[in-house]
Amino acid sequence: MIETDKLAAKAVSAERLISASPASPNEEAFERALRPKLLDEYVGQEKVRGQLDIFMTAAKKRREALDHVLLFGPPGLGKTTLAHIIAREMGVNLRQTSGPVLERPGDLAALLTNLEANDVLFIDEIHRLSPVVEEILYPALEDYQIDIMIGEGPAARSVKLDLQPFTLVGATTRAGMLTNPLRDRFGIVARLEFYTPTELARIVTRSAGLLDARIAEDGALEIAKRSRGTPRIANRLLRRVRDYAEVKADGVITRAVADAALAMLDVDAVGFDLMDRKLLEAILHKFNGGPVGIDNLAAAIGEERDTIEDVLEPYLIQQGYLQRTPRGRVATASAYQHFGLGAPKTGPARDLWDNNA
């Protein structure tokens, strides 16, 4: 049942226009076409860019493989893009895979033994590596060697294989799920942060140019403000606004055109969609602002518990519209203000069975 709920949550996330997860293979292909190729083209993440520039320049001067890199942060912020940029800037090949795909030690061994000197191996969702595969990775990262078993039963023996020097780039949205031994083997650890509206407006303007779409400065900024700090969402909204501009306007994306298009798509001024508003309005109107238990809230809005916890809540909490408390979910003053309501002077409603009430 739990696994079914998780799958349902993933399906809901993929269906949302403002989801940070890739919606389809077609969208992934679209993202690749817009992806910056070099570090100078990469917008935002100034601290991470500065660090990587220094580390890569030093590694190239010494003609060494770049130290292993761990990139973590929310989805859609450019971890995969940075992995490709690292390989291109270092002038080496990139091999890409993901944690769930590497089911057996042999899967990883096959990748490692085919790497050329200083190549980049990119493992997305690295927190989902199985323990047995992770064990193979440790000596590969430290000593550029792997131990493989030859034969079966009593006749089995371990053989040590030397590898070419390489760089592992691991990406994860859940750094806390990495084991300490794996995390400690990364020499470069970088957290990607949400983007500012100004940074996203630059990304939208660049993407519009690649798409041959005409866009005004205020139109790019309007899309950026509703993109939840995430380039993937910004590019997705740009595609839909471009369609609207070509059909309903003269093809130029102005602020007014962007506002009308996004209103049609139910994306409001702060990037909330219908599901975000449904959740907050349920807490505000049905439960007097909270606290309300997660199961009651799920029943009230007709969604699975996992969908609320994994898909809807994170952004609302991060933006300060919702709080998780020991007694349940509580709407904040920002939530009341967003819906034009006055916050209750006595605070949120208390639990009927709260002894402190």
Swiss-Prot record:
It catalyses: ATP + H2O = ADP + phosphate + H(+). Its main location: cytoplasm. Keywords: ATP-binding, Cytoplasm, DNA damage, DNA recombination, DNA repair, DNA-binding, Hydrolase, Nucleotide-binding. One of its GO terms (cellular component) is cytoplasm. Mg(2+) binds at T80. It holds the Pfam family AAA_lid_4. One of its GO terms (molecular function) is ATP hydrolysis activity. CDD domains: AAA. DNA binds at R305, R324, R329. Residues 196-266 are annotated as: Small ATPAse domain (RuvB-S). Its EC number is 3.6.4.-. The RuvA-RuvB-RuvC complex processes Holliday junction (HJ) DNA during genetic recombination and DNA repair, while the RuvA-RuvB complex plays an important role in the rescue of blocked DNA replication forks via replication fork reversal (RFR). RuvA specifically binds to HJ cruciform DNA, conferring on it an open structure. The RuvB hexamer acts as an ATP-dependent pump, pulling dsDNA into and through the RuvAB complex. RuvB forms 2 homohexamers on either side of HJ DNA bound by 1 or 2 RuvA tetramers; 4 subunits per hexamer contact DNA at a time. Belongs to the RuvB family. Homohexamer. Forms an RuvA(8)-RuvB(12)-Holliday junction (HJ) complex. HJ DNA is sandwiched between 2 RuvA tetramers; dsDNA enters through RuvA and exits via RuvB. An RuvB hexamer assembles on each DNA strand where it exits the tetramer. Each RuvB hexamer is contacted by two RuvA subunits (via domain III) on 2 adjacent RuvB subunits; this complex drives branch migration. In the full resolvosome a probable DNA-RuvA(4)-RuvB(12)-RuvC(2) complex forms which resolves the HJ. Has 3 domains, the large (RuvB-L) and small ATPase (RuvB-S) domains and the C-terminal head (RuvB-H) domain. The head domain binds DNA, while the ATPase domains jointly bind ATP, ADP or are empty depending on the state of the subunit in the translocation cycle. During a single DNA translocation step the structure of each domain remains the same, but their relative positions change. This is Holliday junction branch migration complex subunit RuvB. It comes from Ralstonia nicotianae (strain ATCC BAA-1114 / GMI1000) (Ralstonia solanacearum).
